[in-house]
Amino acid sequence: MSAKLTSHIDNLSQLRLATIKPGDVFLGEMDGVDHEKFFIVAGVSGNRILCCSVLINSKINPFIMRRPHMLERQLCLRADEYDFLSHESYVNCAQPFKSRLDFFSDAGYKYKGCLSDIHIKQVQDFLITSGQLTQEEIDLYFPSVI
């Protein structure tokens, strides 16, 4: 690949990284899972290096069904609300993923859409009250929410 093309690809990757925001939905691989998963960016650090994300599942896992504190943190999304969904699905706000934001700038992750303002607010509220994030992490990922 030519140096000019490599530079152009790097610039596009940086542009994509600069535009990622809470509510953005990506489809990509997940370690240990045999199919692609939908990820929702729930919060982004002020320096745009770190992010907090959650998964969309096609059904609620039996493990979660037996745990009321986790079950109450599942947000139902209807397929008629989002073009990227083919059936009713559930946002798992009981198990946040913390990673580098550039995780989603990888070419293996495809942008699929964005949650409505109401749904991203619900996701963020569920995460903030989940007990899965420290106060420092809440302040880092959700400074404009608190």
What role is predicted for each listed range?
Residues 17-18, 31, 81-84:
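A general structural signal for short secondary-structure junctions and capping/turn motifs
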Residues 1-19:
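Mixed-charge, Lys/Arg-rich low-complexity intrinsically disordered regions
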Residues 74-146:
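C-terminal terminal-subdomain/extension
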Residues 12, 67-69, 107, 125:
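Short, functionally important structural connectors and interaction interfaces within domains
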Residues 27-30, 34-79:
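Compact nucleic-acid interaction/catalytic patches
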